[in-house]
A protein has these predicted regions:
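Pyridoxal 5′-phosphate
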Residues: 1-119
Length: 119
């Protein structure tokens, strides 16, 4: 996973980012691909284009492997709870971010994994 979440809470945003966000909010506030109307289809095309550009940039073999989440915590939850970790032993450190530790502790509580936290 590539961590880009700090941009969501960082003070300085490049003018291009602000401009794109404002333009999208003003002109294209739709659920992309969730309907058959013009604006929804336009949003879907824009999202697909972004997904393809990101896939090409990172060398992903398929643009459908690129997913968008509201932030890093949601991405980590999706990954950790989506993996088949049943019966696995996970080793992490006490310095790990809370967004990783909490799902791991929950997986341990459920009995899905055994967990070692190194101090």
């Amino acid at each position: 996973m590539i961590y880009f979440d700090n941009a969501a809470t960082s003070f300085y945003k490049p003018p291009q980012v602000v401009g794109a966000a404002v333009s999208t909010i003003k002109n294209l506030s739709v659920n992309a691909g969730r309907g058959g109307h013009f604006m929804s289809l336009k949003g879907a095309r824009l999202m697909t284009s972004a997904r393809e550009k990101i896939a090409a940039f990172f060398g992903a073999i398929d643009a459908s492997f690129v997913i968008f989440t509201p932030g890093c915590t949601a991405a980590l939850n999706t990954a950790l709870f989506g993996l088949n970790l049943a019966g696995k032993h996970v080793i992490t450190t006490a310095l790990e971010h809370n967004s990783v530790l909490r799902p791991l502790f929950e997986l341990k509580r459920r009995g899905d994994i055994s967990l070692t936290v190194i101090n």
